[in-house]
Structure formats: structure tokens, C-alpha cells
């Protein structure tokens, strides 16, 4: 929200976001980016309020400390109306960022390097409206794949934008879930059971999250629940957030066999639908 406000009105005020309970979600990437573009940032710790103002935004080279999806998006939406050229290094390049850049270009922005981690933005004075079809939600698609497997159901997920799913189909396949691409749809047949693969050397499969094109962290919770009903074992390694796996105690109370190794890792021993 703040990025577009800053670009259009020269100021943006927002209360401190509440966020969720998956771990620390620092906002430094956003505000450091705004400051480099010429904005002044003030945080009122008493009121827990963020204020960002700028008389004039100027293009600059920005090296992001982390490939933050929302941080990159906020900086892009600010830089498109800054004077001069902005280069964003270590930019997030998820499909959602790619479609944001494509939509902004349709509105009159000048962004090149789309789909890479180095974006070049030539500032423009104004943007126009456009028609844009948003991507399907890859988290919902992964959730439906898991839902089909865990309930032994047959489903077809329509219009998934398959080329933008990255590793999602292959990771679910490693859990033993059968699926078939049919054009831009995914067909999942009913399965009585599914068996987790191991690595080539026979060691336990590890599934971990990573920035795009790695496996999205938002689906690790789904993978963990699906694995609890499989045959075999898997190590889930949540690298990005330190509190995301703390829900496993609820699954253990329900009968799941899960060992929480540390805040970032859990070993799931599948019980083949026996709980």
C-alpha cells in the first residue's frame, strides 16, 4: 500500500502491520528501498505508526538484502514514477512479481528484466488503466492437490497456469501423489495410498523451501499434513521462518507421528491413513 501512495501522492502513512505467527517478518527491505529513492522514513514507536514522505523520488541502484516478494513489489510500484532510472538487484522474481511488472507495463511503465532478479525501471510521469487477468493462486492449487490425496479423491484443477507452478507438481509427486497435466489443467486420480520417495542413495527425502524458483514456503504446511497420511518418512526443512512448524503439536495430539527436531525441521513418519 505504501509504495503506490508514495509514488502517487508523495506520502504514505500506515499503522504497524500485525502479521501472522510464522516468525519474524521484518519490514526493513521496504523502507530502506523507499529511502534510497529519496523518501524520508519516520517510525512513531508510541503510536506504532509508519510515515514515509518524499518531495521528489529519484531513480537509483538498489541492492536488496533479501529477495523479498512484497518488498520488491513495493519498491517497483514506487520506482515506476520516480525520476530517472532505477536498477533493483536481488529482486524477487516469483510469477506474482512478473505479472505485476507486466501489468504496470500495460499501464505505461517501462520495466525490463522481468522474470530475472535484476530489474531496470525507467520512471514515467503517469500511468493509465488497463485490463489484466491475474494468475491463479499457486497456494490454492497446491492445497487442492494435497486435499485430493489425503481424502483419496479424484479431482481436476482447471486453468492452473502450469508453467508458473515451478516445483509444486514435482514436490507433490515425490510424496507419491499421481497427477497428470491435461493442457492447462491438473488431473489427480483417486488413490487408496501414496508412498514417499527416497533420495537416489536411499536416504530420507528432504523437502525444503527457497525463493523462486525454489519450493514456496507457504505450501510446506500442506506438504507436512499430506506426508502424515503417506507411507514412508520425510524431513521437512522450513528455512525461512522460525515459528511455522509449531502447529505440529496439534497433529501429534490427533495421532500423527512427527518429530520436531528444532524450530526449522520436522521429521514426518507417515501412517498410511491409519489415524
What residue spans do the PLM features occupy?
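Short, structured segments at the rim of ligand-binding sites
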Residues: 1-275
Amino acid at each position: 500500500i505504501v509504495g503506490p501512495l508514495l509514488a502517487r501522492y508523495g506520502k504514505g502513512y500506515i499503522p504497524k502491520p500485525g502479521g501472522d505467527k510464522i516468525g519474524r517478518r521484518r519490514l526493513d527491505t521496504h523502507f530502506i528501498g523507499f529511502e534510497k529513492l529519496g523518501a524520508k522514513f519516520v517510525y512513531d514507536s508510541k503510536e506504532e505508526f509508519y510515515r514515509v514522505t518524499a518531495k521528489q523520488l529519484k531513480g537509483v541502484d538498489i541492492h536488496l538484502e533479501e529477495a523479498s516478494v512484497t518488498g520488491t513489489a513495493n519498491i517497483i510500484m514506487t520506482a515506476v514514477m520516480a525520476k530517472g532510472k532505477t536498477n533493483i538487484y536481488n529482486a524477487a522474481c516469483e510469477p506474482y512479481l512478473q505479472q505485476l511488472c507486466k501489468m504496470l507495463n500495460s499501464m505505461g511503465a517501462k520495466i525490463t528484466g522481468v522474470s530475472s532478479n535484476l530489474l531496470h525501471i525507467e520512471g514515467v510521469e503517469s500511468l493509465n488503466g488497463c485490463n489484466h487477468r491475474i494468475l491463479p493462486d499457486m497456494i490454492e492449487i497446491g492445497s487442492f492437490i494435497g486435499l485430493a490425496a489425503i481424502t483419496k479423491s479424484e479431482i481436476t484443477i482447471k486453468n492452473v497456469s502450469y508453467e508458473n507452478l515451478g516445483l509444486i507438481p514435482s514436490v507433490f509427486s515425490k510424496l507419491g501423489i499421481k497427477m497428470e497435466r491435461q493442457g492447462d489443467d491438473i488431473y489427480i486420480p483417486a488413490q487408496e495410498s501414496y508412498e514417499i520417495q527416497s533420495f537416489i542413495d536411499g536416504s530420507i527425502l528432504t523437502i525444503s523451501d527457497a525463493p523462486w524458483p525454489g519450493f514456496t514456503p507457504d505450501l510446506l504446511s500442506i506438504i507436512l499434513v499430506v506426508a502424515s497420511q503417506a507411507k514412508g518418512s520425510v524431513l521437512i526443512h522450513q528455512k525461512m521462518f522460525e515459528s511455522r512448524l509449531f502447529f505440529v503439536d496439534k497433529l501429534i495430539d490427533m495421532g500423527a507421528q512427527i518429530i520436531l527436531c528444532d524450530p526449522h525441521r520436522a521429521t514426518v513418519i507417515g501412517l498410511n491413513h491409519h489415524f
